Amino acid sequence: MSKPSLELKGASFTLSVLHINSSDLNAVMAELDSKLAQAPQFFLGAPLVVNLSAIQHNDFNLHGLKELLLSRQLVIVGITGATTVLSKQAKDLGLAIVKAGKQSTTPPPAPRQTKIVKQNIRSGQQVYAKNGDLIIFGAVGNGAEVIADGSIHIYGALRGKAMAGAAGDPTAVIIAHSLEAELVSIAGQYWLAENLQQHSSDKSGCIRLNGESLMVESLPL
């Protein structure tokens, strides 16, 4: 019996959600450009779901938003929270209408292994712990990236980018003796440096998910 030429299978993916709070596209793009400048490689080519729940009028320029995002190498794959009229416009533009899924009550499997690095991670270097946690005895410098499918523990300063729960684990955490990061991300939810500064005045801390938002807890390190 010949193998079928295609298969339909269920799968889950972590997508970033861009919340639009203003119909002024110039203001939206100015703020977005500022964030992109802080972490350009993190967003490059990233598929986005656009949340329009804050936009209640139907003359919003959805086509213009799509073109502006494409010009910055960002790709809208769908929208959520839109009015009926804007949802129809989205379909005409070839965009999917995304409905928020229910939170799973089944916890993800625990990471199977731990990767230990006993050195500083310098600018331009990347360390990835697949299917496990990442422990670093050293500093993560500006321009460096550390990624783990599980949690990330840094016994030193975090000045670069740290992405935990890269495979979608919402229970992952990021712990560092000094939180000075350019970007932190857990299961696709991220903070840039400015967000981290707004939420934490202490150097050491633990970053984790609280529902769908990040939070930071002080640690006596």
Curated annotation (Swiss-Prot):
Biological-process GO terms, alphabetical: cell morphogenesis; division septum assembly; regulation of cell division; regulation of cell septum assembly
Domain of life: Bacteria
Lineage: Bacteria, Pseudomonadati, Pseudomonadota, Gammaproteobacteria, Alteromonadales
Organism: Shewanella sp. (strain W3-18-1)
Name this polypeptide is given: Probable septum site-determining protein MinC
Subunit structure: Interacts with MinD and FtsZ.
Gene: minC
Function: Cell division inhibitor that blocks the formation of polar Z ring septums. Rapidly oscillates between the poles of the cell to destabilize FtsZ filaments that have formed before they mature into polar Z rings. Prevents FtsZ polymerization.
TM regions (residue ranges): none
Keyword line: Cell cycle, Cell division, Septation
Entry-linked HAMAP family: MinC
Record-stated family: Belongs to the MinC family.
